[in-house]
């Protein structure tokens, strides 16, 4: 831990992410026959969750720990700018979480957030690390959880089968790629259709440059707003390294189009030997089943130049609203402390795949991440530079490079700086919403905002029925003007996928029953705010002390025909939730290539100039 403390004290450059979780709801309907009626009014706390990972065991942990709280969980867009959108409508959640984080972006929220600088919670962090979250006036609004590690995942078993040496530096990494290409196996692939991959690989292959004295000096200037341009001294070598990486590995237009799952599926089939991934990916995609996989660093010119790339799993903050009440202030701080204490971080680092940032937290590493230990001791963990514009522009420029639209490092640097100097896209007004809908859940009407979105998706998709977790609609639907960017904030997009399939009525019963009963899953229901919304059919559900039970499904008041077949759209998490319910329904394939929620909202408001479909009373909660 002393070595780890040294590591934490060295991380003065932190700028990263956030996440959230939830809890149990209180007065949400008549209790079931076997349940205890709830007469005591609970304190409502709204928690904005950065991703559906929080719907796993983490939200249930908070529900169990604070039974006196009526938690409302929403899946927020993973951006500090989302909270700017909420602040514009005077509708900030009580507890905020975000993974994509930079002080450069977060400073715009400073006046809306609670100052944590003098709290016991802030005192549990190493002082030098806390400096990274401290403004010039001493204010601290955000605190990090544990660190996600993001580097190269390799299939050691595949290396052994083909007698390819495990890489130790950049030259041996390239040699390994060439050896696998010679036998028809991709040496290295990655999901360059994702902005985070473009940004992380661009930075990852040049960490020694970015960690140099010149690199750290430039980053301080950028984070403070003193410059909005990439330094040629620092960044031209970065682009030179990426061009070399691209050319020697053989990356091109096909790689630019790879979505998140493609490299992982190839890795699972033994079709590629290495890909960019996280500690969580080591658990979820362990090669061909029995393969030994390792999380390796970004390789430098020498072994001493190797680094791992990291970022906080998420940051937490609290809204100012209501914090002038001492009792509520204490409750919010107690919840935040539980989110980042040992027990809370154990629920985040469920697979022993993360590194703690706090003095009072110890997290074990799984064997696949043993390589990381000496890098922790040597303080060789780089924290990615993760401002909103870094994500956006890194993707734009890396895609240009992979598609041969820019052919030299100088052109790439110029293209990046041109984008930095330009206006952010998507900020002009493109739509007007006429009618306000609340996303508060009531047992009589459900979540009306989520119902309006689900009904609109059903109409535009042409499918018979739609089923989606209501918390994917992240806030009230406010009446007024919207930019394209703000339209996207209505519904969670990066974690939600449309699953298109044909289901019998009997399979739909299985789907709903499985969904209500599942635990430890990114589609799990932990309270009323995380229940699902249905479009085209209604659900009769009983709430008990142990959860939720399905009584009946109806269409227009008549029982759903179990023998009939319906075109069906599930909107939710793809890899964990959909795979589990599909197995229960006996379905092996699902089409997830359709539009996401933002696409349907754009079609409705921008392309058609329309409005949302009216909500329906889709649930009876007993």
Region spans (language model):
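Extracytoplasmic/periplasmic substrate-recognition and gating elements
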Residues: 287-350
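Extracytoplasmic/periplasmic solute-binding protein
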Residues: 141-145, 174-227, 272
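Hinge/lid segment of periplasmic solute-binding proteins
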Residues: 99-151, 165, 174, 200-201, ...
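Feature captures C-terminal
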Residues: 447, 451-622
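Glycine-centered hinge/linker elements that transmit conformational signals in sensory
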Residues: 222-256
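A structural signal for short loop-to-beta-strand junctions that line the ligand-binding cleft
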Residues: 85, 93-94, 122-157, 186-191, ...
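Conserved N-terminal structural module of periplasmic/extracytoplasmic solute-binding proteins
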Residues: 6, 21-103, 121, 166, ...
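C-terminal capping/gating helix-and-loop segments adjacent to ligand/active sites or protein-protein/ligand interfaces
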Residues: 72, 310, 349-422
